[in-house]
Amino acid sequence: MSVPTYERKESKIEFLDKAIQLHKFVASILCERFSKKFTFYGINKTYEYAAKIAENCIKANSYDLYTYYNERTFLFNDAIATLNCLSIQLSLIKEYSNKVTEKQWAKLGVDIANLRNYLKAIIKSDKERFDKKK
C-alpha cells in the first residue's frame, strides 16, 4: 500500500466501510419475504452484485497505486459498473417485496450513489497521484 494504515485519514478508507455497509444492508433487505417466482434469480444475483462490489473495493485498496495502477483502476471501474447493475436489479425486485419500506429503498439508493461518487473521486485522485509521480 502506498500509505501505511496508521497514517491514513478516515476519509481515505471510508469507501471500504460504505461498500461493506452496502453489502450488509442489501443482505438484510434480501432476507425479507419475496415472491417465489423471483426468489432464485433475483435474490441470488442481487446478493452476488453486492458481494462483488465489496470484494472489488477491498482488493483494489490492497494494491499499491504505483505498482498496480491499471489493475487498481480496473477493479474500481468494475465496482462502479456492478453498482449500476445492482441499482437496476434492485429496481426490478422492488415490486416483489411489500415488507421493505420506501425509506429503506431510499436509503439504499443514497448509499449506492454515495459509493459511486466515492469510487469516482478515488479514481480521479489516483490518476493525479500517479501522473504526479511520473
In which residue ranges do the predicted regions lie?
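Amphipathic alpha-helical assembly/interaction segments
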Residues: 1-134
